[in-house]
C-alpha cells in the first residue's frame, strides 16, 4: 500500500510503502493496540484514500513508540511468529494433496509430466508436479505469507510522527 502524508513536516512523513503482505499485519497490529485512535480510518485494508487526520496519526505514533520502547511490540511479533510456526501445513487445494496437478491448465503447462529432480524433495525422481505446493501435497497456511517485524512498525511510527495525517492509496 502507498501511504501518503497529508501535510508532512519532515521527509519521513511524506510517504510510507508496504506491499500488501507487510501492510495487512501492520494495519491489524495498529488496530489491535490502539482501536479508538484507529477507528478514524474505516478502510485500513483498501487503497481508497482513507486514513487518519494529523491528531490521530500523532496519537498512534505515540502509542507505537511507547510499545516499541517497552518491548511490547517485540513480544507481540514473537508471539505471532510462534503461533504461525505452530500452525499445521494444509492440504493443497490445487492437487488435492497428491502433489501432482492434472487439471487442464496444468496438463497444458506440462506439470503432469515434469520430473522432480530436487534432492531431498519427498517425491524426488517422481513424475508430476504442482506449482502451488511444489509437488509436496501440503503447504504452509496462507496467513504465514504475511510477515510482521519490529523494524516495519518503527518505520511506520516515524512516518506517523511527521505525516500530518495520511491517506492510504
Predicted region positions:
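Acidic (Asp/Glu-rich) sequence patches and key acidic residues
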Residues: 1-169
